[in-house]
């Protein structure tokens, strides 16, 4: 059990590092965010099953709802940016450029 939690935590850390390293493309950032949400869902599911508390059972469902909303908004933003600028480079979105 402890090894599974360690692997899931490492997956979250690698997704976070991927978000920080591959931030030039919006699609890769969205994929890393989805990986982070998936690991959060798995961790909260394991925690709620181990705690045997009725209060903890809806928390994984709430995280799934947030993940679905994040995916929908992210894909809508990706479509809008690619239609407007022709690519998914994040540098095009910087408003501080002269």
Swiss-Prot record:
TM region(s), chain numbering: 2-22, 26-46, 59-79
Catalysed reactions listed for this entry: a ubiquinone + NADH + 5 H(+)(in) = a ubiquinol + NAD(+) + 4 H(+)(out)
A Pfam entry, by short name: Oxidored_q2
GO BP, sorted A to Z: ATP synthesis coupled electron transport
Subcellular location field: Mitochondrion inner membrane
Keyword NADP: no
EC numbers, comma separated: 7.1.1.2
Alphabetical UniProt keywords: Electron transport, Membrane, Mitochondrion, Mitochondrion inner membrane, NAD, Respiratory chain, Translocase, Transmembrane, Transmembrane helix, Transport, Ubiquinone
Record flagged with keyword Coiled coil: no
GO molecular function: NADH dehydrogenase (ubiquinone) activity
Broad class of the protein's primary localization: mitochondrion
One Gene Ontology term, aspect cellular component: mitochondrial inner membrane
Top enzyme class: translocase
Topology versus the membrane: Multi-pass membrane protein
Similarity field: Belongs to the complex I subunit 4L family.
Function summary: Core subunit of the mitochondrial membrane respiratory chain NADH dehydrogenase (Complex I) which catalyzes electron transfer from NADH through the respiratory chain, using ubiquinone as an electron acceptor. Part of the enzyme membrane arm which is embedded in the lipid bilayer and involved in proton translocation.
Complex formation: Core subunit of respiratory chain NADH dehydrogenase (Complex I) which is composed of 45 different subunits.
Protein name: NADH-ubiquinone oxidoreductase chain 4L
UniProt lineage: Eukaryota, Metazoa, Chordata, Craniata, Vertebrata
Gene that specifies this protein: MT-ND4L
């Amino acid at each position: 059990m402890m090894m599974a939690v360690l692997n899931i935590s490492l997956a979250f850390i690698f997704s976070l590092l991927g978000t920080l390293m591959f931030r030039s493309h919006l699609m890769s950032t969205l994929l890393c965010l989805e990986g982070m949400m998936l690991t959060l869902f798995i961790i909260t599911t394991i925690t709620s099953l181990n705690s045997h508390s009725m209060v903890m059972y809806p928390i994984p469902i709430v995280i799934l709802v947030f993940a679905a909303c994040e995916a929908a908004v992210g894909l809508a933003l990706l479509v809008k940016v690619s239609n407007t600028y022709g690519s998914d480079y994040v540098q095009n979105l910087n408003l501080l450029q002269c």
